[in-house]
Amino acid sequence: MPLDKDSNPNSYMYSHQHIIYTALCVVHSPQTFGIDPVPISWGHPDPLVRGPIICTVRHFNQRNAIGAHSGSYCIYTGLAVAAGKLNPSYVPNLKLTSPVLNIGPYPSWYDPKKIASIDPFGHLTTEAYSAYLDKGFDIRPTIAVTKAHIDLPECREAVRTGRLKPDGKILMPSGQSVCHKAAIEPVWYLPEIARRFGCTETHLRQSIFRMTNGMYPELITRPDIKIFLPPIGGMTIYIWGDPDTIPDEDIELTCRVHDECNGSDVFGSDICTCRPYLTHAIEEAIKTAQRGGAGLVIYYRKEGRSLGEVTKYLVYNTRKRQEGGDSAENYFNCTEQVAGVQDTRFQALMPDPLHFLGVTKIHNFISMSDMKYNAIVNTGIKIVKRVEIPKELVPEDAQVEITAKVFHGYNAGKAYQGIDEEELKKCKGRDYKYEGGDGISDKDEGSVPKQSDSNVVEEHA
């Protein structure tokens, strides 16, 4: 089928009949006449042989990916079209969008066991797939790389107190730091995703189809299409210092992988250690860059252990209202009581951006999380030193979190040694005094069962 360049919203391409026809073709079997997806050979070192990811509405017969670009924001694209604000056939002008620095290629790009949740060629759309673009294919970047000036009050305070020393290149006298950053949308190669989670590809497809209420029927009807752009948040990479040093094991690399926590990261809630640990990592990243190395922070959109912010706040209420109040002893079980599971972040996919950057050795890992540590080293990346959050940075109400995590296996380092069962039982959180505010008091709520010692995982690391 020829590529349709018609941009008239009143044309047949945008008629009700054509939309229905498109829907039927998209979900039909691969044997349907006229359906001819561009082949994908995931892991091939030649981007043309590997093939471009095509997941747009303009060329459904050539689509080789399930889902849509922009993750959860694709729904807003639909709203923009429905409101008459966006022409559904609009093709982005990518002329001035190329990355501001070169990344790769690295051998890890060609190993599905190292990269299967992002497209390593996702930032090279105009470079690697110009021939397709010239033919009219609508190929969208899934990675964008730019520069930034980061202005954090913690860094300004660090300059004022002398913890950080401005150098005029990486850190300005104002406390602003200069870095590169890359935004990445998830692109899943389903066979490898299934392998990492210990299930069959068929079971993975069926589970996603079922738990999204049938949102993606092609997961069932198009087993020939192995690429899926899930409707989830992606990640942002921040790099301080020279990015070219990152693959060099002899040059210092400081790294933190951080999972989103809007309440703490943005608004400064003191119920967890997320923002102080993040800003501490940024300080250490700046210092490493000033020593000639590189500092790296990877920020994942995994709000509330990937359970979402509504669920997280329900858990907060459960923690504060349970019999005896908020306690480290029962910290983990509250999430399971509300959500049915303690954590859905599943760090098996987390190391992929590290391999995208060519990381093979991390000298300073700013995290106490065993889950993250194990996920990274299990892919072959060496970690020399694990850095705990300084005790003085732990907020008052976050003592419950840090105490529970260390007791149940969080890497304690030197600062948190000696947390035993007595300390666990003694550690209590702030009383929010809900009684009288909404008619619910502690005595009205059922008690939460005592925390089990099995299957304990951490919230944010």
Predicted regions and their residues:
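Catalytic domains of riboflavin
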Residues: 1-461
